[in-house]
């Protein structure tokens, strides 16, 4: 058996990407960090994106923080998802930053959300906070594209949320809007403001917003593919 090592270049095919992701299954984050030559933080309070960065190193991801997918040549986005002992998601999943201005003529088909979710490599990771970060194990990966029904659900929520943004109602949107997709503030601090449209069409400053997949959506997705019990 060949020694496990990070991919130094982006994988040339989905099959190679999935094969590498499958090899990581069962390893702890600490083991993978040591083999990759990086330090494991004590917790994720100041390093929220650390797990994603670690797996990007192992899988040869190319995009970094650019708007394209993590594996641009393959059109695949990488999403790590913390799960409990039953394989259920512990938190919502960030998709992308929401555009709050310049949205005339934008459609679901050409939207950034749909582009990011067209093809996703889901990698579940143990997320129970009672387990030290270095001891949390990586689960089996899943290469996924939305079904017709999932695409319909996402589109309906996206259209509702974008209508509210365009009509100057961004400040009225709460995390309860949307069945499977939600919009909520995404900023490291409350002073990081961005331009948006106000209720009377005037420019306003507000917190940046991000699109997130709700837990019910990702739970159903994982349950269906991994045959988990889905209450």
From Swiss-Prot:
Among Pfam families, the record links this protein to: MutH
Record InterPro entries: DNA_mismatch_repair_MutH, DNA_rep_MutH/RE_typeII_Sau3AI, DNA_rep_MutH/T2_RE_sf, Restrct_endonuc-II-like
Q: List the GO cellular component terms.
A: cytoplasm
Q: Which UniProt keywords apply?
A: Cytoplasm, DNA damage, DNA repair, Endonuclease, Hydrolase, Nuclease
Q: Which CDD domains match?
A: MutH-like (cd00583)
A GO MF label: endonuclease activity
Residue ranges of coiled coil = none
Family that this chain belongs to: Belongs to the MutH family.
Q: What is this protein called?
A: DNA mismatch repair protein MutH
| Encoding gene (name) | mutH
């Amino acid at each position: 058996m060949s020694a496990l090592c990070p991919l130094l270049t982006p994988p040339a095919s989905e099959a190679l990407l999935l094969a590498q992701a499958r090899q990581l299954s069962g390893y702890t984050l600490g083991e993978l960090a040591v083999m990759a030559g990086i330090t494991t933080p004590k917790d994720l309070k100041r390093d929220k994106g650390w797990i994603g960065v670690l797996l990007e190193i192992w899988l040869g991801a190319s995009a970094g923080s650019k708007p394209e997918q993590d594996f641009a040549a393959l059109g695949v986005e990488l999403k790590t998802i913390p799960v409990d002992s039953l394989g259920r998601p512990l938190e919502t999943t960030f998709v992308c930053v929401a555009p709050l201005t310049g949205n005339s003529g934008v459609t679901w088909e050409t939207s950034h959300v749909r582009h990011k979710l067209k093809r996703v490599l889901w990698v579940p990771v143990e997320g129970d906070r009672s387990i030290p970060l270095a001891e949390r194990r990586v689960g089996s990966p899943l290469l996924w594209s939305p079904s017709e029904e999932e695409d319909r659900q996402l589109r309906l929520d996206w259209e509702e949320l974008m209508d509210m943004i365009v009509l100057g109602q961004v400040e009225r949107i709460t995390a309860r809007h949307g069945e499977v997709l939600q919009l909520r503030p995404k900023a490291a601090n409350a002073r990081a403001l961005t331009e948006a449209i106000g209720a009377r069409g005037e420019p306003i400053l507000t917190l940046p917003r991000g699109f997130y997949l709700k837990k019910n959506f990702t739970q159903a997705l994982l349950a269906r593919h991994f045959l988990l019990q889905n209450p």
